Amino acid sequence: MDKKISISQIKEVVQQAYEQVKGNTGGKNADYIPYLANIDKNLFGISVCLLNGQTITVGDFDYRFGIESVSKVHTAILILRQYGAQKVLEMIGADATGLPFNSIIAILLENDHPSTPLVNAGAISACSMVTPIGNSDKKWDAIVQNITDLCGSAPQLIEELYKSETATNFNNRSIAWLLKNYNRIYDDPNMSLDLYTRQCSLGVTAQMLSVAAGTVANGGVNPVTKKQVFDAELTPKITSMIATVGFYEHSGDWMYTSGIPAKTGVGGGVMGVLPGVFGVSAFAPPLDGSGNSVKAQLAIKYIMNKLGLNVFNGARVTIVD
């Protein structure tokens, strides 16, 4: 089944999504991280990155917010690049836990591996795997360069957010040392946790995340810079991780209602990948009870459903002028 969608249609639907959702008052900012609690709750932006490099944007698409857990996708890509798909599967895994993103119980139940790079335990383990082992500065450079390659522009560390995260990350400290207990962390636990905390504190925009999603959708080639960031054979591995764990214990509901693999973060960002078609991102700080942006979810669902797109419907989608 073939489906053609015009760029003007996408522009119209993105604008409609913004207008439909911007007045929504549901949710509240993350309050357990002081920096996030004080972000303007009315900020809202959407960006779609087409595979020709064109971005369609509306609202606060260029506001820099904390990438938070969306960074897990980026570092998963980095270790897939450095180690290959099979080694990542062996050292971390790719299973959904069915539990909240910061679950300690999940480690106790599945102590032979941290489950997936897209939950906190697996993400901390992923940071520990980044090469060169033992060199925090070079590992950090690799993490930032990888995000830069994916987004097409450099993220900026939000120092105030980093300090807030570091002062309140008690649960993640427990996770790091529990992983050490089970030999599932591959570098110094404190260093690995700090790298994870820093990467979550990087400032990005909805437009940047849409380009990163577009890079995944485009078989590893950044649509804007045209750089081959990773091998195309990794795309289904990355997309399957996002589909099964992107919304943690609610990933099934998300896929059922939206039809697009997407990753969420408590900074208010959501990044969705529709392979072979486009990348999409939306940002708004107020979160639902599971830590997912209320407006971003509604906006992306609106776009997907209005355009009649779904990763599972088997349609070959062509975007025309």
Curated annotation (Swiss-Prot):
Keyword Hydrolase: yes
Superkingdom of the source species: Bacteria
GO molecular function: glutaminase activity
Binding-site residues, substrate: 69, 120, 165, 172, 196, 248, 266
Keyword Hydrolase applies: yes
Keyword list, A-Z: Hydrolase
Reaction equations catalysed: L-glutamine + H2O = L-glutamate + NH4(+)
Catalytic class of the enzyme: hydrolase
EC number from the UniProt entry: 3.5.1.2
Record-level GO BP terms: glutamate biosynthetic process; glutamine catabolic process
Pfam families linked: Glutaminase (PF04960)
Oligomeric and partner information: Homotetramer.
UniProt family annotation: Belongs to the glutaminase family.
PANTHER family: GLUTAMINASE, GLUTAMINASE 1
Record protein name field: Glutaminase
Organism of derivation: Bacteroides fragilis (strain ATCC 25285 / DSM 2151 / CCUG 4856 / JCM 11019 / LMG 10263 / NCTC 9343 / Onslow / VPI 2553 / EN-2)
